[in-house]
């Protein structure tokens, strides 16, 4: 039996995707009363992680439109001058195709059968939006300050690969050294290139601390020019240029000199913070982060109700005054919603189509003695595309059974060569035979307005490598809507709280 919803709250949040979860936790942490609803029976929405047996739920996310009799019944809950607004159900994930790929006559038993018999299907955790965390980036800072990090675990992305392609050798994957020790041990760079790379790293360190007048002047002259031109002026050769732009500069696609330097400094600042790699990946998949922020919100009093679709919202004098869910009316001062729910009458200001393919394999794209979490920038192989990358995760990240891997290909739909074509070239070169594939298009929709002044539309899914833009957009939305409140302030340690208690008592006595 459905529980009765509260009659009134400060904020109603629709959808449990990562941005909605961040905003819900920020509201609850700031002392606002929050009701968090999701029509799905699971957390994460379009940012979820699914087991292989549950992934069909992605395709079963449609809600039928209200008919005239339902509208008439809901209208009984309205007061004078109020009107019903039906929520949208936009296709954020579309063109979904899932295929089990036969191995041929030599296969004794289909892989699907093997996994089912061994009860391994539920051990996969398949991300709709795979991302990584920068060790000293905005997301890690937010996780630590808010103590959401108490609910999550992470693994170091311990291998970056840089691809090169020639007609003779095809695509070759070269390991990328990140730390100074790895640079000097690397066989991928010559002695001269190692020295030039160390010189560039030193320059970045000096530039970020404003220690080199000559460097600042050189950068100012090339600030809006391509990063490659700036590197050339610094005497960096073509091979090392490609290495820097495609690995150290992975945080920024098609960089100018300024954005390339900022990305390089971010990269190197994160190296050594948790280990030799600057990147982290959440155990059990990226969908875990949504649940972690929801837990924080619940700790501070947010009410949760999954499987409770909102039928309509109520508008009066240009503002949303209530939501109606399963016949219950909940009055509210603000509403936060996923882009999926923005009414169909409101046009999107922009839409970016993101190509996503997930492969399941039983062999890594580059075998090693120990299993690696791998990041591979494909920008050099798809120069016309804004985003092209592979992320390979497996048992070490708790996203696949032992001996199995998930390869996530992500790319924007630009240029003549698709990210799928490049991924399959890499598989062929390294004799990797995927046994399962899921492909889909993710629509990143942005809205300038949702048709009412007290509605906050959460940031959409995006093609960015890490979470900085999501966190920053959530921060800006929160601070614009509630300028008098702090966005997920740093939690006080128990010692600080205990020290403050006696002081409070003394003030009270005086």
Curated annotation (Swiss-Prot):
It is found in: Cytoplasm. One of its GO terms (cellular component) is nucleus. The keyword DNA-binding does not apply. It comes from the Eukaryota. Expressed in several neurons including head neurons, motor neurons located in the ventral nerve cord, HSN and CAN neurons, and tail neurons, and in muscles such as body-wall, pharyngeal, intestinal and anal sphincter. Also expressed in seam cells, the hypodermis and the intestine. Disruption phenotype: RNAi-mediated knockdown results in mild defecation defects. RNAi-mediated knockdown increases the levels of unprenylated rab-27. RNAi-mediated knockdown disrupts the localization of rab-5 and rab-7. Changing residue 107 to K: In ta208; embryonic lethality in some animals and reduces brood size. Some animals have abnormal germ-line development and gonad morphology. InterPro entries: FAD/NAD-bd_sf, GDP_dissociation_inhibitor, Rab_escort, RabGDI. GO terms for biological process: intracellular protein transport; small GTPase-mediated signal transduction; vesicle-mediated transport. SUPFAM superfamilies: FAD/NAD(P)-binding domain. Gene3D superfamilies: FAD/NAD(P)-binding domain, Guanine Nucleotide Dissociation Inhibitor, domain 1, Guanine Nucleotide Dissociation Inhibitor, domain 2. One of its GO terms (molecular function) is Rab GDP-dissociation inhibitor activity. Keywords: Cytoplasm, GTPase activation. May interact with rab-5, rab-7 and rab-11. Does not interact with rab-3, rab-27 and rab-10. Substrate-binding subunit of the Rab geranylgeranyltransferase (GGTase) complex. Binds unprenylated Rab proteins and presents the substrate peptide to the catalytic component B and remains bound to it after the geranylgeranyl transfer reaction. The component A is thought to be regenerated by transferring its prenylated Rab back to the donor membrane. Plays a role in neurotransmitter release from presynaptic terminals at neuromuscular junctions. Positively regulates the function of rab-27 in synaptic transmission most likely through mediating rab-27 prenylation. Belongs to the Rab GDI family. This is Rab proteins geranylgeranyltransferase component A 1. It comes from Caenorhabditis elegans. The gene is rep-1.
């Amino acid at each position: 039996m459905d529980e009765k919803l509260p009659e009134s709250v400060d904020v109603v949040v629709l959808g449990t995707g990562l941005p909605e979860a961040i905003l819900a936790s920020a509201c609850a942490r700031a002392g606002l009363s929050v009701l968090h609803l999701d029509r799905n029976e699971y957390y994460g929405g379009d940012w979820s992680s699914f087991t292989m047996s549950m992934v069909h739920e992605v395709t079963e996310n449609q809600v039928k439109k209200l008919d005239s009799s339902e509208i008439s019944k809901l209208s009984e809950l309205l007061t004078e001058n109020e009107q019903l607004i039906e929520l949208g159900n936009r296709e954020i994930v579309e063109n979904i195709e899932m295929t089990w790929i036969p191995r041929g006559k030599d296969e004794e038993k289909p892989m699907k059968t093997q996994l089912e018999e061994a009860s391994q299907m539920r051990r996969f955790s398949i991300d709709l939006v795979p991302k990584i965390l920068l060790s000293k980036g905005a997301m890690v800072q937010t996780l630590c300050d808010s103590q959401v990090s108490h609910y999550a675990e992470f693994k170091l992305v311990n291998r970056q690969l840089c691809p090169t392609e020639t007609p003779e050798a095809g695509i070759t994957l070269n390991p990328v050294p990140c730390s100074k020790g790895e640079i000097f041990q690397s066989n991928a760079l010559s002695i001269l290139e190692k020295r030039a790379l160390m010189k560039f790293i030193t320059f970045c360190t000096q530039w970020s601390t404003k220690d080199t007048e000559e460097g600042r002047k050189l950068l100012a002259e090339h600030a809006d020019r391509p990063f490659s031109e700036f590197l050339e002026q610094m005497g960096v050769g073509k091979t090392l240029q490609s290495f820097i732009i495609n690995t150290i500069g992975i945080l920024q696609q098609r960089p100018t000199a300024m954005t390339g330097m900022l990305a390089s400094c971010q990269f190197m600042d994160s190296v050594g913070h948790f280990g030799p790699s600057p990147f982290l990946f959440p155990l059990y998949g990226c969908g875990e982060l949504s649940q972690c922020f929801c837990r924080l919100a619940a700790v501070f009093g947010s009410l949760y109700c999954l499987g409770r679709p909102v039928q309509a919202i109520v508008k009066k004098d240009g503002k949303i005054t209530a939501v109606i869910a399963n016949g219950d009316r909940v009055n509210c001062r603000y509403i936060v919603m996923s882009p999926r729910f923005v009414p169909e009458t409101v046009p999107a200001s922009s839409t970016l189509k993101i190509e996503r393919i997930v492969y399941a394999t039983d062999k890594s794209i580059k075998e090693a003695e120990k299993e690696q979490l791998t990041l591979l920038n494909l920008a050099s192989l798809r120069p016309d595309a804004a985003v092209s990358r592979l992320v390979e995760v497996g048992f070490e990240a708790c996203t696949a059974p032992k001996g199995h891997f998930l390869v996530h290909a992500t790319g924007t739909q630009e240029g003549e060569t698709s990210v799928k074509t490049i991924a399959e070239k890499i598989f062929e070169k390294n004799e990797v035979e995927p046994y399962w594939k899921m492909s889909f298009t993710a629509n990143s929709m942005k809205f300038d307005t949702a048709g009412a002044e007290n509605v906050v539309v959460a940031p959409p899914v995006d093609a960015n490598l890490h979470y900085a833009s999501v966190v920053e957009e959530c921060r800006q939305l929160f601070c614009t809507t509630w300028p008098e409140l702090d966005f997920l302030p740093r939690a006080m340690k128990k010692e600080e709280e205990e020290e403050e208690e006696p002081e409070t008592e003394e003030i009270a006595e005086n």
